[in-house]
Regions:
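Nucleotide-activated donor-binding/catalytic signature segment of Leloir-type glycosyltransferases, i.e.
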Residues: 236, 246-263
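Conserved acidic donor-binding segment of nucleotide-sugar-dependent glycosyltransferases
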Residues: 315-316, 320-327, 336-341
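Donor nucleotide-sugar binding/catalytic pocket of nucleotide-sugar-dependent glycosyltransferases
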Residues: 54-55, 134-186
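A short, well-ordered alpha-helix in the C-terminal region of glycosyltransferases
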Residues: 342-357, 366-368
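A conserved mid-protein helix/loop that constitutes part of the nucleotide-sugar donor-binding site
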Residues: 16-21, 199, 203-222, 328
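Short hydrophobic beta-strand element within catalytic cores of glycosyltransferases
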Residues: 291, 300-303
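Glycosyltransferase donor-sugar binding loop
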Residues: 35-40, 171, 204, 231-245
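Aromatic "clamp/platform" in nucleotide-sugar-dependent glycosyltransferases that forms part
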Residues: 264, 283
Length: 376
């Protein structure tokens, strides 16, 4: 009989996007149950991955009463399912499921830390975040930081004294190199968005403050004034409530003739192929998939010196690394990328650097090996 494992995230989109294909792979070796808040993405996961799913409502934000209800629901679920392992990702699912699994005495309790919020927070908020992550670690038997930067921050802030393990070279699920490739079909689609004799900078992600959008738009505005043969393509949704960009930034995005906002896109590959440079000036990350994806599509990347990004990108090899929240450094990096010879040199190494370290099936092999080591 296969051992049972439960994989959790707070919202179903995380299971859908971050663990694509991984749950199906694991189901060949274990009985897999996927758990998250309800939603159409959870139904999508069940059909695509071929695993059983269970909906347990969980709030992303702090909500003591609702969190308590979610905790009791998870305890009831774990009592009923009696899994060998509970493995969570995302903060709230991690906190609640590790507590519930500890109460239920589940033998193997794993939490994967992706992006950490507390290193860039301050005051009471930072103390609360550190406390909740410390509780998660106290209840877990095994802790998996997504990369070296997350590993370093967990140690630096003394979140736990337990051993920390990174799977492979980092990242949750690796990169599907067959999907993220310049196939003839993608090249054809990209022609709709390409502009000749224009250097296109592309950003993919939420259009929010802590992705560095204010600095990016301001730096590009200056760049375009000096070099009119430039364009900025933004792929991703605005967020009105959580961390919105400045009003003047949004106005510039909507009105500037050389800035094209594409909104949410199910397939970002044509936009990457239609661009010359990928720009990701985020303030904080765990291990950004989108930088892996841009590199796999052959783009040199400009990234900030933050966790994950500075592990994927090597200075002057497949991109350049700049200080976070530094508009002038961003401007200078974008200006440097206008040199075609420099771009091509970095682009040649972009895909090989990703393929050698983050190929998906290689990471799956390492994850499965790690799971097997816990079976005892």
């Amino acid at each position: 009989m296969k051992k049972k494992i439960i994989r959790l995230s707070t919202i179903p989109m995380s299971l859908d996007i971050l663990l694509q294909g991984q749950l199906r792979m694991l189901s060949e070796h274990y009985e897999v149950v996927a758990v998250s808040s309800p939603g159409s993405d959870l139904e999508k996961v069940e059909k695509r991955e071929g695993v059983r799913t269970v909906a347990v409502p969980m709030e992303r934000q702090i909500s003591p009463l609702r969190d308590l209800v979610s905790l009791f629901r998870l305890i009831r679920l774990f009592h009923r399912e009696k899994p060998w392992m509970v493995h969570s990702l995302t903060p709230k699912a991690g906190l609640l499921s590790m507590m519930a699994a500890w109460i239920c005495r589940i033998p193997v309790r794993i939490h994967s830390f992706t992006g950490l919020v507390f290193p860039t927070a301050s005051g009471l908020k930072q103390k609360i975040l550190i406390a909740t992550d410390s509780i998660t670690c106290a209840c877990a038997t095994t802790i998996l930081p997504e990369g070296k930067g997350v590993h370093r921050d967990l140690e630096r802030f003394q979140i736990t004294s337990k051993p920390l393990n990174i799977i492979g070279n980092g990242n949750i699920n690796g990169i599907d190199l067959e999907f993220f490739d310049q196939t003839p079909a993608i090249l054809e689609q990209a022609e709709k968005y390409r502009k000749e004799e224009v250097v296109t900078f592309c950003f993919v992600g939420r259009i929010v403050r802590d992705k560095g959008i204010n600095e990016l738009v301001s730096a590009f505005q200056r760049l375009h004034q000096a070099y009119p043969n430039t364009r900025l393509v933004l792929v991703g949704p605005f967020e009105e409530q959580l961390d919105p960009v400045l009003p003047e930034t949004r106005q510039m995005i909507e009105q500037h003739t050389a800035i094209e906002w594409m909104g949410w896109q199910d397939d970002i590959r044509p936009f990457l192929v239609a661009s010359e440079v990928f720009v990701f000036p985020s303030y904080r990350e765990g291990f950004p998939n989108v930088v892996l994806q841009a590199g796999a599509m052959g783009l040199p990347c400009i990234v900030t010196d933050i966790n994950g990004s500075n592990e994927i990108i090597s200075e002057s090899i497949n991109g350049c690394i700049i200080p976070s929240q530094n508009e002038q450094a961003l401007y200078e990096a974008m200006e440097k990328m206008l040199n075609q010879e420099e771009r091509q040199k970095l682009a040649q190494q972009a895909r090989p650097q990703i393929a050698n370290r983050y190929e998906r099936k290689a990471l799956w092999k390492e994850l499965l090996k790690f799971y097997r080591s816990l079976e005892g």
